[in-house]
Amino acid sequence: MVWLLAILAYLLGSLSFAVLLSRWFGTQDPRASGSGNPGATNMLRVAGKKLAILTLLGDVGKGLLPVLVARWLGLGVMEEAWVGIAAVIGHLYPLYFNFRGGKGVATAAGMLLGLYPPAVLLAAAAWLLTFKLSRTSSLASLVATPLTLPLLAWQQPGALLPMTVLTGLIVWRHRANLRDLFAGRERHF
């Protein structure tokens, strides 16, 4: 059951809302504009607030839905988390878009919302504070994501290993941003 859900979650995660919305609304392909990342932040840059919000909602939803389905089917929190990670991996390496995906932060937030909502509140507060101080989305994501781990270790220990793996995936997908941050070249808003 877990494997079937994980495959379905991966396929759902492979839907790139940024790319689909850019096609539907006739705007620039986010993979060829701005930062080149098909995510909500780049959609804000290349297509405006409306499409950025729709992208964010779609990306959060595709992380949330598989976790809720796994819970509805009676799986444990660890299995729910692994199913959610499959959706994030779909976002990172989408089958339908030549495995060229986004950074996974919004999809991970949706997954986390399904697993333990207070962790999303902590991550959102950390993201907003870091972004307010730095005006840098990638830095905010890199600060917010690992901050959820101690809370999960305390409140949802079954989700800790999958979330640690997820944190590693998100840091890995931000490796170019890390290089740019250290070199002083990272984009700011």
Curated annotation (Swiss-Prot):
It is found in: Cell inner membrane. It catalyses: an acyl phosphate + sn-glycerol 3-phosphate = a 1-acyl-sn-glycero-3-phosphate + phosphate. InterPro entries: G3P_acylTferase_PlsY (IPR003811). GO terms for cellular component: plasma membrane. One of its GO terms (molecular function) is acyl-phosphate glycerol-3-phosphate acyltransferase activity. Pathway: Lipid metabolism; phospholipid metabolism. It comes from the Bacteria. The chain crosses the membrane at residues 1-21, 50-70, 72-92, 111-131, 151-171. Its EC number is 2.3.1.275. Belongs to the PlsY family. HAMAP family: PlsY (MF_01043). Catalyzes the transfer of an acyl group from acyl-phosphate (acyl-PO(4)) to glycerol-3-phosphate (G3P) to form lysophosphatidic acid (LPA). This enzyme utilizes acyl-phosphate as fatty acyl donor, but not acyl-CoA or acyl-ACP. Probably interacts with PlsX. This is Glycerol-3-phosphate acyltransferase. The gene is plsY.
